Design a protein with these regions (language model features):
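Active-site pocket-shaping loop/turn-to-helix segments
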Residues: 11-38, 55-56, 78-92, 104, ...
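Extreme N-terminal starter segment of soluble prokaryotic enzymes
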Residues: 1-6
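N-terminal extracellular/periplasmic Venus flytrap/periplasmic-binding protein-like
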Residues: 11, 23-32, 167-218
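Phosphate/pyrophosphate-binding loops at sites that engage ATP/ADP/AMP, CoA/4′-phosphopantetheine
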Residues: 35-47, 157, 161-163
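Short acidic, glycine/serine/threonine-rich loops at helix termini
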Residues: 17-19, 59, 116-122
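Conserved catalytic cysteine-centered active-site region
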Residues: 52-103, 144-149, 207-218
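Active-site-proximal alpha-helical scaffold in enzymes
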Residues: 82-112, 158-188
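Flexible glycine-/small-residue-enriched beta->alpha junction loops
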Residues: 105-156
Length: 218
């Protein structure tokens, strides 16, 4: 068995839905980061490119991203979808391929754009077709199970583990405070790949407070 190592990585600034990246397709965002990764680490032709994507942007979007970045057409690329764990699972798959001796160098990660994800519609032959033109959330559970969205899943997990809202609020405040500190001190600059004119992460809230969190429904 070969050992697998993470040699480095880059990420874009993180946006929000309908924010600074709202008009930029996922494959373009991913391609811009991929180009900078390949330049920084001098990777011309990796054995594979593996990318996670959970919103179902259609086709083999990892390969679309790779070709958009100018990667040679001979380099195989494929997409992994395990929803929120897609990017991390891509890295695990890459490690397994290297462990097995199938590959030596793989670029792995994940990318999403909820702002530009395609609309979806059932074919009239599908049993769930109701005449509606579009649906916003894909089906994850068969009819014998109730669909559970991620927020409900988080609530169930918190209840099972005995985690209170007050405990989570403290983590929220700590997280935003540390993220703000890291941004102000430039601690993340060596892993940031600036793309599409972005200059900062949109999700960090320097003014986050307990008063704001108290407004949220319990």
């Amino acid at each position: 068995m070969e050992n697998a190592y993470i040699l480095g990585g880059l990420r874009s600034y993180v946006g929000v839905v309908n924010g600074m990246y709202r008009h930029i397709p996922a494959e373009v965002l991913g391609a811009e980061v991929l180009k900078q990764v390949m330049e920084k680490y001098q990777l011309r032709e990796p054995d594979y490119i593996i990318a996670g994507n959970g919103v179902g942007a259609g086709g083999n979007i990892a390969r679309l991203m790779a070709l958009t970045a100018g990667v040679d057409i001979s380099v195989p690329a494929f997409t992994v979808d395990v929803q929120c764990g897609s990017g991390l699972e891509s890295i695990a798959v890459a490690a397994a391929k290297i462990n097995s001796g199938e590959a030596d160098v793989i670029i792995a990660g994940g990318f999403e754009s909820s702002s530009t994800q395609p609309r979806r519609g059932y074919n009239p032959n599908h049993p769930d077709y109701t005449g509606d033109a579009w649906y916003s959330v894909a089906k994850f559970m068969p009819g014998i199970h109730r669909e559970t969205v991620m927020l409900e899943g988080a609530e169930l997990a918190a209840k099972r583990e005995g985690i209170t809202k007050e405990e989570m609020d403290s983590w929220v405040l700590r997280s935003h405070a540390l993220a703000t500190q890291a941004r102000e001190q430039g601690l993340l600059q060596n892993i940031i790949a600036p793309v599409c004119g972005a200059v900062k992460d949109e999700g960090i809230r320097p003014r986050m407070s307990q008063r704001l969190l108290d407004r949220m429904p319990k």
